[in-house]
């Protein structure tokens, strides 16, 4: 992408960040009356997994306003749980955590490790991870705007370890102020090369 295109994307990012901050003040109070403002596409596969009692790894990228998914998910899948990375600002972390929990979603701190997530998947729960964050040198590097970015491989690793499907869940803000949520099943894969793990290959795909 050109420098001009990257600058435009950065400007849009900060504009949407401001909108998300305003939404953060009220999302915990959302109820059925807000349903017309959220359109969900592709939930058929998720419903099928729930009927089968199949655990699902839900990959949630930081697009649109991902916080609106907290009040939405209990209606999409029974007893969902989410792994949360702590915020550096303790006051903001306490506020966001309280408002997420009001929605009825089961928030698990990152420091608790992966065992609760594995148990949740094996019992048929949906486990959400916001995993498009900098994973440092131990992450999987994927191309992003022409540069290699380090990403968490934990969603793919959990899916491979429990033989659970991965569902991509992305929220997008529409021009009329509503939100569109897209659910898409990520294809099952095997490693692209002998040097790369299945989890790394899967991370590159989503």
Model regions: which residues?
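Acidic side chains
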Residues: 23, 67, 79, 132-134, ...
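A conditional alpha-helix N-cap/helix-loop micro-motif detector
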Residues: 36-40, 89, 107-110, 148-149, ...
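Catalytic core of membrane glycerolipid acyltransferases/transacylases, capturing the structured
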Residues: 16, 54-111, 137-140
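Generic preference for hydrophobic
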Residues: 40, 82, 107, 183-185
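Membrane-anchoring hydrophobic helices of lipid-metabolizing enzymes
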Residues: 1-60, 93-98, 104
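Generic structural "secondary-structure junction" signal
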Residues: 26-29, 40-42, 68, 89, ...
């Amino acid at each position: 992408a050109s420098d001009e295109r990257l600058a435009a994307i950065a400007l849009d990012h900060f504009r949407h960040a401001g909108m998300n901050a305003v939404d953060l003040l009220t999302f915990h109070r959302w109820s059925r009356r807000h349903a017309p403002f959220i359109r969900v596409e592709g939930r058929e596969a998720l419903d099928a997994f729930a009927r089968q009692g199949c655990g699902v790894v839900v990959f949630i990228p930081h697009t649109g306003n991902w916080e609106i998914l907290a009040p939405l998910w209990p209606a999409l899948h029974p007893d969902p749980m989410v792994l949360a990375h702590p915020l550096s600002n303790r006051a903001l972390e306490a506020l966001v955590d309280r408002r997420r929990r009001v929605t009825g979603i089961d928030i698990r701190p990152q420091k608790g490790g992966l065992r609760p997530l594995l148990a949740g998947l094996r019992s048929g729960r949906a486990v959400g991870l916001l995993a498009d964050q900098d994973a440092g040198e131990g992450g999987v590097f994927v191309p992003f705007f022409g540069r290699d970015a380090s990403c968490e491989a934990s969603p793919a690793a959990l899916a491979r370890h429990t033989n659970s499907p991965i569902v991509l869940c992305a929220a997008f803000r529409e021009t009329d102020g509503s939100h569109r949520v897209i659910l898409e099943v990520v294809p099952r894969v095997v490693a692209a090369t002998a040097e790369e793990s299945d989890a790394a290959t899967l991370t590159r795909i989503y």
